[in-house]
């Protein structure tokens, strides 16, 4: 259920016909249903004016309500969840009503621009001890959204009356934001620095909390190019803001992605690949849910995995959720990002207390053995355990494994603060129960409260890191 507050008188006019709601309730009639969507095509920015709306939206809209007040800046509606334990907001999208409110930093510094990632992109400019994350831009994968990116940056520079001394971009060279950063740096003769995706996540949550001491960071998301060329996403990182040193301490067990991007759209591929990693190549008593729909493709998958044809490895926490959801029969395929993980979160039997094992493997490189979570899920499904119980045991096992890993590194490094970031931290179970479990282990969690934990926070992490970099280079 989504709750929307009217922010213009126009909303009252549009909804005036619903004033009979009380009568409907009294007469036991069906209440009217409203479907809300923003004024844009998928993956494109919101239409800015009447003419643009007519050109871009006439195929999907039957009626246009014009207004004589021009829109100067595109701004989506903000989307939040509420942490039921703490009451704190958990941003999914930070835009209308919250931007351009600044995030206050620990120190004053020079002006830095963080151009953001490719998905859920924002840009951030720093000014003194303040960082200004922009409103939601979207997925920067087409010309229209890239133009909005440039348009918004120009607007922010004019509003704040600043020009960046450093531009920070993602490690991935093919992101349109990375290409734009290099072009902008060349045009303005500004240096461009590179910060890996998941370190940017951790620097974002540290900056938001004005925390400058060393911290252990969990960056849990879907994808990001790692320093070793593989796809990261289930990372335990050491970050030292004082001198900007960092280290990858551990990661989730690798899972192959047969078909690359196709595996993201079809989680059954990830599930079957994960099963093969633990030695399971055929169904047990539990029939794999995807066999009816994808029996032919499933038969070819072992050969693709064996020859590693278009099959990158990932340590992604998001892909782990996808695999488990597919195993549970919740999503063979998806039509929107996070669909499989959302279903897995929602179906949990919250009365269940048993957790699957998720041990830390001490060999180099150190890994959290998330393959054991897959094994636990498979064994329970074979034994006929209901999916809601399986889903809950998976969540509890992951939380237990993360806490054990954090505690182990805390003892080794004498560091007690644990920063939590990444799109998986939008999962309300992890967002509420993981910080509590860390506190019970004697650790101090640092979480997002002012910006989303998803990739929308990347530009903040880039900008805060870049500002510290300039301060170190020019004390």
Regions flagged by a language model, labelled:
Residues 170, 189-201, 416-421, 428, ...:
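Conserved phosphate-binding/catalytic loops in two-lobed NTP-binding clefts
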Residues 34, 112-114, 168, 215-219, ...:
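Short glycine-aspartate micro-motif
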Residues 33-45, 172, 221-231, 308-331, ...:
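Conserved phosphate/anionic-ligand binding catalytic regions in large, soluble enzymes, centered on
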Residues 77-81, 121-126, 218, 234-238, ...:
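Short beta-strand scaffold segments in enzyme catalytic cores
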Residues 247-261, 285-286, 305-309, 443-449:
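Short beta-alpha connecting loops at secondary-structure transitions
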Residues 117-147, 151-155, 179, 273-415, ...:
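A contiguous, well-structured pocket-lining segment that forms one wall/lid of small-molecule binding clefts
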Residues 198-220, 224-226, 267-276, 395, ...:
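Glycine-rich phosphate-binding/hydrolytic loop that grips phosphoryl groups
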Residues 1-168, 172-187:
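Active-site-adjacent structural elements in enzyme catalytic cores
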């Amino acid at each position: 259920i989504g709750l929307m507050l009217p922010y213009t008188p126009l909303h009252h006019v549009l909804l005036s016909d619903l004033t009979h709601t009380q009568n409907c309730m009294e007469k036991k009639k069906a209440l009217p249903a409203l479907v809300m969507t923003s004024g844009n095509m998928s993956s494109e920015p919101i239409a800015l004016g009447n003419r643009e709306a007519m050109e871009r939206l006439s195929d999907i809209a039957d009626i246009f309500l014009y207004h004589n007040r021009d829109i100067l800046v595109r701004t989506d509606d903000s989307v939040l969840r509420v942490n039921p334990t703490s009451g704190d907001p958990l941003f999914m999208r930070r835009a209308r009503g919250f931007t351009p409110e600044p995030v206050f930093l620990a120190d004053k510094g020079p002006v830095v621009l963080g151009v953001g990632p490719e998905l859920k992109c924002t840009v951030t400019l720093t000014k003194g001890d303040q960082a200004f994350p922009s409103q939601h831009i979207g997925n920067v994968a087409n010309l229209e959204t890239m133009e909005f990116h440039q348009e918004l940056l120009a607007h922010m520079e004019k509003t704040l009356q600043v020009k960046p001394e450093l531009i920070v971009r993602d490690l991935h060279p093919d992101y349109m934001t990375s290409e734009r950063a290099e072009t902008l740096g060349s045009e303005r003769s500004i240096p461009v620095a590179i910060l890996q995706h998941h370190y940017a996540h951790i620097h974002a949550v540290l900056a938001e909390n004005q925390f400058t001491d060393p911290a252990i960071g969990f960056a849990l998301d879907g994808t990001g190019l790692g320093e070793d060329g593989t796809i990261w996403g289930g990372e335990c990182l050491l970050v030292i803001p004082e001198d900007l040193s960092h280290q990858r301490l551990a990661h989730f067990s690798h899972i192959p992605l047969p078909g690359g991007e196709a595996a993201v759209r079809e989680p059954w591929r990830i599930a079957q690949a994960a099963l093969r990693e633990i030695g399971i190549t055929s169904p047990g008593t539990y029939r794999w849910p995807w066999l009816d729909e994808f029996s032919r493709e499933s038969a070819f998958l072992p050969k693709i995995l064996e020859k590693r044809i278009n099959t990158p490895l990932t340590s992604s926490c998001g892909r782990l959720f996808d695999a488990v959801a597919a195993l549970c029969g919740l999503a063979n395929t998806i039509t929107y990002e996070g669909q499989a993980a959302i279903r897995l979160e929602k179906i949990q039997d919250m009365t269940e207390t048993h957790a699957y094992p998720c041990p830390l493997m001490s060999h180099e490189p150190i890994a959290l053995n998330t393959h054991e979570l897959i094994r636990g899920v498979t064994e329970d499904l074979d034994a006929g355990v209901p999916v809601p119980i399986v889903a809950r045991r998976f969540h509890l096992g992951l939380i237990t494994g993360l806490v054990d890993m954090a505690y182990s590194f805390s003892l080794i490094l004498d560091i007690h603060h644990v920063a939590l970031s990444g799109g998986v931290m939008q999962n309300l179970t992890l967002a509420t129960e993981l910080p509590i479990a860390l506190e019970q282990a004697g650790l101090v969690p640092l979480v997002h409260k002012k910006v989303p934990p998803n990739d929308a926070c990347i530009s903040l992490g880039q900008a805060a890191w870049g500002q510290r970099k300039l301060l170190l280079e020019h004390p």
